[in-house]
Amino acid sequence: IYFAGQMQNINMLGSSSEIINNLVKSQQYLIDEIYLFQDQFKESLVNAATDITGYGFIGHLKEMVESSNLYRQSNNLEPLKVLLDLFAFKAYPGVFDLIRKDVKSTFFESNKEIFDKIYKVNKQKRIINFLNENSLDQETFNERISLLLDPQTCGPLLISCNRKYENVLKDKWYKVGEVVKM
């Protein structure tokens, strides 16, 4: 969203330096931290992981859940779904202003099609649901979803881990949802 705004000559002076600094910052230290925790606990910390580039958060999460459910189906296990907290996602200052101005990246519409296919499914069978969906007005819900459809160019990491590691990871990572059985 930030770069789409820049291409439209919308300047976000309050966020520009923070965004650029984060773009050039390697995320290798986060991977190294996961390896350290795995060494400490003597077991795998991560069930699945991906970086959020191209398909936005929703697209990558969809791929992770569908892949897990294929494995689970072939092993006669109950399928999973994810409950997301739309207010757990952080955004740079000014990003929601850009969303309200209808600033979108070039991949937004294709990512929106992915979301629409997920969202039109009956809520009970949907692989991605939203914890606070019923308490939000439609405008706020759409703004939050727009954030999750933005194709990051240097995206953060999305990991799925066992709930027992939540307290260990919460200092440098943040929880945006939980995986539950369908």
Regions picked out by a protein language model, each given a short descriptive name:
Residues I1-M182:
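Helix-biased detector of long, well-ordered alpha-helical tracts
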